[in-house]
Amino acid sequence: MKCLLHYANFLEMAELEWFTFPLRKADRCLIQYRGFLIRERDAGKLMPSTVSEYMRSAISFYRWALSHGLLDVTTPLWRDKAVYVRFFDSVGFERTILRLTTDLSIPNKTHLGLRLEDGLLPVSAADREALLELAKTSSSQELYRMLALGFFTGMRLGSICDLKIQTLENAVEDPVAKGLFCINIGPGASPPVRTKFGVTGRVWIPKPLLDDLLEYANSLRRSKRQARATSENKYLVFLTRYGNPYCANDSEQSTSVNTEMVTFRRKGMQAGIKVASSFHFHQSRCTFATELATIALSTTDPINAIALVRDALLHKDEATSLKYIKFVTQTPAKQAAANEFTRAFMGINNADKFQP
């Protein structure tokens, strides 16, 4: 349903009808949707796998509509073609399967190289401080605290928007790390807090941030929002000015946050913060994970570092955590290579510059 909703939103945005297929192919809704998806993928707004799934779902919908007589067109919507896929089974024998595809399908072209969660990269410590200072002075109190939670706990936006006041009140200080508290999130926590893949676990939160959130939870600003909220939403830490949750049920996305992030990026560019032009909320989580991996590798072996990152970020498996470890271990080599190339280039430039 999410895929079809995306297609329906595109049709509404482009002011197109789903059942209109003119003779000119470029004017057809499916062709325009395909081009839109490819542009979104190339701009980094959608993952290649997501784009392929969206297009596949749209084609499946039209197959269903045609088979049930809901669509009457005289021109073919696409050309079917057979594709043979070879693979090796668990025993090691080569197998071949026949798949039916179309000329409208979008191949899942993955990017080469190491990619972190959602294909985003962390920001530097200096950029993090600049972004937080900008959010504190130029954005809403809610966005500032959400970004602080992302940068210093690594929680996803869906979990932050579903955070309960009681979750903060139940925080327990880590016995071996003074100044760090632990909060329980996930479907198995009490109260439950939404997490991706339904993983239950503990998240670290610094004491100053915890104290600030508890103070905000009892502030007049939030009390006014709580008064407008329904009984089931009154105990959420973050509420919109209309008393609604920032994220819909079972959603990792927030329209309110996305809208404010657009304004935030614009103000960041005006303030001269270059990283703000392409900054996404999820980069706060990437930044936390990268810094945690760096600290972990400096104090323990890679195996324990992977386990630490996995537990702190509530990864479903260790494969995602391993990406951060690899990213951190590759960074010094990249920096050394960049410095060497810069020195070599400057040497060539200077030699040319002062050559008689």
Predicted regions mapped to residue ranges:
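Conserved tyrosine-mediated DNA breakage-rejoining catalytic core shared by Y-recombinases
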Residues: 163-212, 223-229, 233
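N-terminal core-binding DNA-recognition domain of tyrosine recombinases/integrases
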Residues: 1-94, 133
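C-terminal secondary-structure termini that scaffold catalytic or DNA-interacting sites
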Residues: 339-356
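Active-site/catalytic core of tyrosine-dependent DNA strand-transfer enzymes
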Residues: 206-276
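Basic, Lys/Arg- and aromatic-enriched nucleic-acid-binding interface segment
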Residues: 125-157, 305
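Short, basic (Lys/Arg/His-rich) helix/loop patches that form interaction surfaces
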Residues: 258-311
